Amino acid sequence: MASSPCKLPIGSAGEIVAMVVYTSFAIGGSLGNIFIILVIYRTPRLKTVCGVLIANMAVADLMITSIVMPIMVFTLVQGFLKLCFYDTAIYIAFLIALFSGAASLLTLTALSVDRCFAVCRPMKHKAMATLTKVKVIIAKTWVKSLLLPIVELFYRDSVPAKYIQTLGVIGCYAIILVSGVLTIRNVRASSSRIAAMHNDQGRVRMTAELKQRNKQVAKTMAVVVTLFTLCWIPIAFVISVKIPDTQDRIFFWFATLGLANSSLNPWIYFYRQINYREALKMLLGCKKSLSNDRVIADPSNETLETK
């Protein structure tokens, strides 16, 4: 049965479920992203290159949870009231989602390269990766992210523009993949070196601790990248195959899955990273100060100490 032009084509039960889902993700995601930004801003030892990149990704995610998701809730309410002006609201949400998604992917790419550099060349990373440089990278990231909504607004049916978008996404994932492979190879090589240093207990212990941190770095990045991929690939596929009615159920729920990624990201960091959990406790007044035994000597890895 055809859907009313004044209602999203997901049925009354679907609208109720969607309202609950979007409201929950909007509240939980906004709180999580705000907490990430605040703990990095208020904790000096988290203000590293990695920390600033994570905060930038939280800003991009906050755009989704605090703007796009409330717009979707508003749209669902208008559907119940049988008013016919939600199309404009959805299009605005779509443009903001494109902008935020591009910023997230570019930031995730920069974060993957930074972590690979920190693991494979820690001394060079410490000397070369500065906050000034990363702020320039972040500024360029937001400028580049404007390309997607601009293309959607003015060159929607342009084939070259679509190819450029596709190549951009593939290029980012290629960089992330190469960075991940190099990181894993370095961690495995470290394991072999530890096994060969059985006569030097002091070096074995220090190297083993570094190797463990590096493994956790790889795991954390793998979780974040995998979640991003699983959430966004379905809707990207639906858009690429050009389903005739882009307002159908499949498009709506796959889009919801993609947007949900912005609500989940901050809680991944709090779950896996001890430093972030402790900083959050301080922020909420549950803990007076960070314990000294959690301080990590190597600034390149300090924001990725995990469970």
Walk through the language-model features, giving the residues of each.
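Helix-to-loop junction signature of class
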Residues: 22-26, 63-82, 97, 101-108, ...
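Non-transmembrane, juxtamembrane loop and terminal tail segments
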Residues: 194-206, 284-307
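Extracellular N-terminal segment of 7TM GPCRs
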Residues: 1-35, 76, 305-307
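Seventh transmembrane helix
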Residues: 175-181, 219, 227-240, 250-299
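Extracellular TM2-ECL1-early TM3 structural module of rhodopsin-like
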Residues: 11-23, 49-112, 118, 162-166
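Fourth transmembrane helix
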Residues: 63, 74-77, 100-113, 117-160, ...
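Intracellular effector-coupling site of seven-transmembrane GPCRs
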Residues: 59-60, 182-235
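Alpha-helical transmembrane segments of multi-pass membrane proteins
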Residues: 26-29, 56-68, 133-149, 169-173, ...
